[in-house]
Structures are given as structure tokens and as C-alpha cells.
A protein has these predicted regions:
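Surface-exposed alpha-helical segments enriched in charged/polar residues
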Residues: 55-56, 121
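Acyl-donor (CoA/ACP) binding surface of acyl/acetyltransferases
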Residues: 1-33, 66-181
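A short helix-loop-beta-strand connector motif used in the catalytic cores of GNAT acetyltransferases and
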Residues: 56-68
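Conserved GNAT-fold acetyl-CoA-binding loop/helix
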Residues: 34-55
Length: 181
């Protein structure tokens, strides 16, 4: 448990800044293939890279932010993130690509949908983002359903956009506008 503030919802979940006590959790994301699962884990990486990023800006930077998804008892269940993406003309508005990763023991219980709702609510309340996007592996049916449940609309398929587990993978892009579909 850290001493940083939380953004809570009625779902028993909270979003909060990454704290020093979460560094072991972040290490697991780099060193345990099961932690991120088959759709996200890119292979072994430099475990120290996540610690360096935390030391640099606490994972709350101007172009990307990562928050801990925390259960009511303080257990970190995963991470929620966003990063700025540029679309259209310069100064045409802010667009964030969001992401969510839950540890295997917390998947399949509706936490992903609840965490997506919290992240959407947070971004539309505290940023000027007009558009949110999410990309997911085309085979990640659970994530696709979660995105659709919270109002994202499928916009298309990015063919063979990511190389993972020995093959090129398609991704599906979803979007949600501040004022609805």
C-alpha cells in the first residue's frame, strides 16, 4: 500500500499513482510471461527500465501516464494507462490511446470493464481529451467485449501491425468520443 491519493469508484476499485511500493509489481510485468498474458507480453525486457521511468516522472508524464488499478483491500490488480496520439491537423484536439492490463488472477471477474469505466470517467473529467482510442489484439475477445460494453465503437482492423509470439498479429482499433458515438 502506498500513501498516494486514489481516484475511486463505486465498483470497489480505485486508480492511483504508481508508488515506490509498486516497483516489485512493475518488475513482474517485465519478468513473468503470464503477468501480461498472451496479448500483451512482448518478451523479456530490461526490468530496470520501468524503475528508471518511475524515478524520472513517477509514471505521470506529459505524454503518457500509468496508474495502478487497486482493489478495495489495497491489492494492485493491474495497470491502466494512456498516451497522447496525434490525429489530424496540429492543434485539432487531444486524443489518448488507453490501455489496461490485469494480472491473470484478476481477469474474468468484470474488473476490466469496471477499470475501463473508471479510466474513461477520469480522463473525461480531468483532461481536455475529445477522443479516446484503444487498440487490442484481434484475438483478444475479452478485451474487445469490455471496450464495447463501456461504449467504444470498433473503427477498423490494423493488419499485421504487431509481432508477438513468432507471428504478425492484427489489431482492432476502437474509439470513444467525449460527446458519445
Amino acid at each position: 500500500m502506498t500513501d498516494v491519493g486514489q481516484y475511486a469508484a463505486d465498483s470497489g476499485l480505485a486508480l492511483r499513482a504508481i508508488g515506490a511500493g509498486d516497483l516489485g509489481f512493475l518488475d513482474r510485468l517485465c519478468s513473468d510471461p503470464e503477468a501480461l498474458g498472451p496479448f500483451e507480453w512482448p518478451g523479456f525486457g530490461d526490468v530496470r527500465a520501468r524503475r528508471r521511468r518511475w524515478e524520472q516522472d513517477g509514471y505521470a508524464g506529459p505524454d503518457s501516464t500509468v496508474l495502478a488499478v487497486v482493489l478495495a483491500d489495497g491489492t494492485v490488480a493491474g495497470i491502466a494507462s494512456w498516451r497522447t496520439v496525434r490525429r489530424g491537423q496540429p492543434d485539432s484536439g487531444i486524443c489518448y490511446e488507453i490501455g489496461l492490463a490485469l494480472l491473470p488472477e484478476h481477469r474474468g471477474h468484470g474488473l476490466g470493464t469496471a477499470a475501463h469505466r473508471m479510466l474513461i470517467d477520469y480522463l473525461f473529467k480531468f483532461t481536455v481529451a475529445h477522443r479516446l482510442e484503444a487498440l487490442t489484439d484481434a484475438a483478444n475477445v475479452a478485451e474487445r467485449k469490455a471496450l464495447e460494453r463501456v461504449g467504444f465503437e470498433r473503427e477498423g482492423v490494423l493488419r499485421e501491425v504487431a509481432f508477438r509470439h513468432g507471428s504478425w498479429r492484427d489489431a482492432v482499433i476502437y474509439a470513444l468520443l467525449r460527446d458519445g458515438p
